[in-house]
Amino acid sequence: MSTILESLPTGQKVGIAFSGGLDTSAALHWMKLKGAVPYAYTANLGQPDEDDYDAIPKRAIEYGAAGARLIDCRAQLVAEGIAALQSGAFHITTAGVTYFNTTPIGRAVTGTMLVAAMKEDGVNIWGDGSTYKGNDIERFYRYGLLVNPDLKIYKPWLDQTFIDELGGRAEMSEFMNQAGFAYKMSAEKAYSTDSNLLGATHEAKDLESLESGIKIVNPIMGVAFWRDDVKIAAEEVTVRFEAGQPVALNGVEYKDPVELLLEANRIGGRHGLGMSDQIENRIIEAKSRGIYEAPGLALLYIAYERLVTGIHNEDTIEQYRENGRRLGRLLYQGRWFDPQAIMLRETAQRWVARAITGEVKIELRRGNDYSILSTKSPNLTYQPERLSMEKVASTFSPRDRIGQLTMRNLDITDTRDKLRVYSQVGLLTPGESSALPQIKGDSDK
């Protein structure tokens, strides 16, 4: 039996993820007029461009909602964001600049917490504003059904009747004005923006063209660091972790992780830290492009990664990075709470993050330009005296190294033999400019 409803279920409770914007406002009022019983659920995700959350449920009631609730998701959002940081769950990078999966994390929190609230109210039909070409339609589908197996999905933007009547923003604005709500359509931007406390996503419209760059974006969490008229002074900041948890910035301890991340956003935002321009693969395998902001997570990640490399050994770090990339993809695909994701995440939190205690001092400049100034931790396995070039007491002698190098003769000989075989069968045909050695066997001499 299909869980997708293609037409409006009249006479039934329908929950809608309500942002208060034009799209969801028009959809809610339209559903009311068509005979459904709409309930509005608004997630407080600490969006930097939203300054009055309390007014949103009131507007929903005004537009015809039978009930409206504001769900504070900030603590859970930050908890999941820190869990992603601890496990390195970030798979999208360009030349070392990372996208911190802030929208997928937000969808995991929104999808589960709003549907849980709906379930409490006896609402088993859910709608939201995601389109059929994007990632969110699948993310919300998965998270919603995880929480409520009886959930049905109704999306006005998949209902042809709704599309025929209110297919564009101009039509929706006129519809709301005719209903007496004097709804003023906001100015059309050159791109769309979605944000939460962890970060912001700018995409679509003009940004779909790769000829348009980051310079057309007006940052909402930081500064346009690429502009010459934006003055940015270098700033030193210290970040302290205890057992994998960020606990202090510039010596100030924060008991509330939300407040710590807000301050990290302010610090990083002053420099435009954490902005990136990425080409990525959506869940349906089509490529898309986004410009992202995440100043606070970027700041914490610099310090966390520095401590990871100073505390853990090479094989542990390699496993952490490989698992992190796999986990990042699962998170992106809406599988953050799937068993395989939980296994990868908790492994990193237990065996990597728990040892991360220490303090890192960083100098921030413009954009992602920074320097690490100092690293302190009681758990460091970095011991400079072991490899010092000065004359100090050493853990091994020159004779020990001679023995170690002599043992390498075995695999060097094996490598030489393999290269010779590859050359004989035509797999290797190095020319004069090749860095590969001209391998010859005894019979070739």
From Swiss-Prot:
Pathway: Amino-acid biosynthesis; L-arginine biosynthesis; L-arginine from L-ornithine and carbamoyl phosphate: step 2/3. The keyword Cytoplasm applies. It is found in: Cytoplasm. L-citrulline binds at Y99, N135, R139, S192, T201, E203, E280. One of its GO terms (molecular function) is argininosuccinate synthase activity. PROSITE patterns: ARGININOSUCCIN_SYN_1, ARGININOSUCCIN_SYN_2. One of its GO terms (cellular component) is cytoplasm. It catalyses: L-citrulline + L-aspartate + ATP = 2-(N(omega)-L-arginino)succinate + AMP + diphosphate + H(+). Keywords: Amino-acid biosynthesis, Arginine biosynthesis, ATP-binding, Cytoplasm, Ligase, Nucleotide-binding. Homotetramer. Belongs to the argininosuccinate synthase family. Type 2 subfamily. HAMAP family: Arg_succ_synth_type2. This is Argininosuccinate synthase. It comes from Burkholderia ambifaria (strain ATCC BAA-244 / DSM 16087 / CCUG 44356 / LMG 19182 / AMMD) (Burkholderia cepacia (strain AMMD)). The lineage of its organism: Bacteria, Pseudomonadati, Pseudomonadota, Betaproteobacteria, Burkholderiales.
